[in-house]
Amino acid sequence: PIDPEMCTRCGACVSVCPENAIDASFQIDLDKCKSHRACVTECASIGAINFERTDQAREGEFDLILDLQEIPSIQISQKPQGYFAPGPDPFEQSMAASQLMGMVGEFEKPKYFSYNEKICAHGRNGQVGCSACIDVCSTKAITSSFKNGQGKVEVNPNLCMGCGACATVCPSGAMRYNYPSVAYQGKQVKTLAQTYLGALKSTKAGDAAPSLLIHSQKAGTALLDHLGRAARLHPKETSGLPAFVIPLAVEHIASTGIDLWLGSLAYGFGEVLLLLSGDEDPGYRLALTEQVDLTNSILVAMGYSKRIQCITANASEDIAPVSKVMSELRQRKAHKLLANPASFALSLQKRETLETSLEHLLQFAPQALPAEGVPLPAHSPLGGLIVNKDACTLCMSCVGACPEGALLDNPDEPQLSFIEKQCVQCGLCEQTCPESAITLSPRLRSIEHRKEKVTLNKTEPFHCISCGKAFGTLKMVELMLGRIGSHQAFSGEALERLKMCSDCRVVDMMKKEL
């Protein structure tokens, strides 16, 4: 009944209560209260006590929140900055309070991402296509937004913790990580590869390639420090990093993806190792595992061996799995170069970087890709489409739904064309097609085939039986006549009128009325 925000802590209610039902915390024990309401009378000028008041949900914006509930209001692996939920332990509560007291002043928070709505494949025509970034975000910072049938995603920068997983799983590159960007990381990787390979030129191991070990800045660095100390103290039991393994620290391990990995291989690294140090959200581990499987599938399709590997530890002190992998690498020795080191720079555009890296690796691939391509996992951003020509009426709904311009129509004749290089396998065309005539086909084909504009379906135009003007496709009109031709409303002359263009139908109806 006592509103803590209105209460002035004067203590008048405590003094006048005959049952001593109000304690020093200014809470009323309703089991003791006999409803004399002397406290209400005493507090009339303030109005802080009201037995008729019901619980109301309140909203507000705060920089710092101390949640003392046993079950916190926010239950996600990465809590927002400024939110503390220490639980019921008094010691943890005091530690959280101490941290809060020190958080005074103004702080700058980087904007980790940039978003290009134009190439986002989230939604068109009221249909949802890709929602990979929404599904993977552990802080729930990304939400879906539709306006006039057009879908996009919105990111709350205050909830974003900079993991970068959204950019890793984004097939189109609409979501881009900027802390740092792939272009900046590409310069780092290129410099590391060139320096290492340059030092090996004068040795017999000139064709050996270094291994790139990517790890998170905080937990990953701590894990490698533990590994290094253990290897110095117990060299027989613990294996440190071999000389050909080059570590690279990033803000968060989930921020790296297929574009940086393939770019690293193109620059001269023999393999890419991803160190998971135990502080990642389970969803991030799953996403990285899927991306690793996809990248290895692409490499195997080109005739290479699997060159991307996850090293999974459960904490920064869990050095055993890392030591085991390092021991295996030391015995195996360094990989050979996959291809001549590339000279191109990684782009800010994910698809451009991906295509450039693929083209370089395909140039030196041990085997050529078959014309029909090699199947890839279902979550692949690369692939084509299969169109059921018997079901397709060439209504071109798919063309209007495609956000990447992979599907094209022909203004001169009923024809559906496709450029596989542009397709991100978002599924919007499949969702939009009224005849369910489109099926996604994740696969890897040669660069020449992927750049080629191919015709998926075409038919003859239907001409108005009155004026001869083309106003639809032959298949569409035949399908329409087959579906509604038996209805009594379209018998006789009315059925023939369906074979006319819109102008001639009006003229024909006016003639019949006159």
Give, region by region, the residue ranges found by the protein language model.
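Terminal amphipathic helices with adjacent charged low-complexity linkers/tails
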Residues: 37, 146-193, 286-291, 308-314
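Long, compositionally biased charged/polar accessory segments in the mid-to-C-terminal portions
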Residues: 241-245, 267-271, 276, 470-475, ...
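Cofactor-cradling patches in redox/metallo enzymes
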Residues: 256, 260-318
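Conserved acidic residues
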Residues: 61-65, 211, 245, 270, ...
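Mobile, glycine- and charge-enriched loop segments
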Residues: 219-254
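Ferredoxin-type iron-sulfur electron-transfer modules and their immediate structural context
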Residues: 1-136, 140, 209-222, 285, ...
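Large, well-folded core regions of big proteins
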Residues: 163, 191-213, 223
